[in-house]
């Protein structure tokens, strides 16, 4: 995994970024924060796609946030739906892709995720991990999600851990 700079979408330079990782690491809430930041502070046109349909309450909660920040949301479950959602956001500055939490050892689910990310045409795949997780669990996640082309790492709550 390389250290990458900040996301820098701009007019005519669309960037598509997916958040992947185990359940409960903060993928969804951090994508909402990024969407709001780029939409409100940098006046970027932002679209959000969620492929996390495992719990309807999650989609409803996400829709509440995207409505609040006026960020369009597309919900997808298949590669075909992902292609359609990408077409909906053609011309947007930043497209953020939320994915379902997957156990790093679930290679079948990770292969399906990889196919969805190909259809999304992502530029970056951020692996989202808990900053207070064990070194073993982090290494397992890096290895497990490596096949989807991880380009960066996001560690929410980094400021909350003790050194």
Predicted feature locations:
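Switch- and interface-adjacent substructures of P-loop NTPase systems
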Residues: 52, 99-101
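Conserved catalytic-core segment of NTP-binding enzymes
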Residues: 59-61, 68, 77-88, 94, ...
């Amino acid at each position: 995994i390389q250290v990458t700079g900040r996301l820098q979408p701009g007019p005519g330079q669309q960037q598509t970024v997916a958040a992947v990782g185990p359940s409960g690491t903060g993928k969804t809430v951090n994508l909402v924060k990024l969407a709001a930041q780029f939409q409100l502070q940098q006046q970027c046109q932002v679209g959000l796609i969620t492929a996390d349909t495992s719990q309807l309450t999650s989609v409803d909660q996400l829709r509440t946030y995207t409505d609040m920040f006026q960020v369009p949301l597309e919900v997808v479950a298949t590669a075909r739906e992902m292609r359609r959602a990408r077409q909906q956001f053609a011309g947007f500055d930043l497209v953020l892709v939320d994915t379902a939490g997957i156990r790093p050892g679930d290679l079948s689910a990770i292969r399906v995720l990889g196919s969805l990310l190909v259809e999304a045409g992502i530029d970056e795949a951020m692996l989202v991990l808990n900053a207070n997780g064990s070194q073993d669990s982090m290494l397992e996640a890096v290895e497990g999600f490596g096949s989807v082309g991880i380009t960066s790492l996001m560690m929410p709550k980094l400021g909350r851990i003790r050194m």
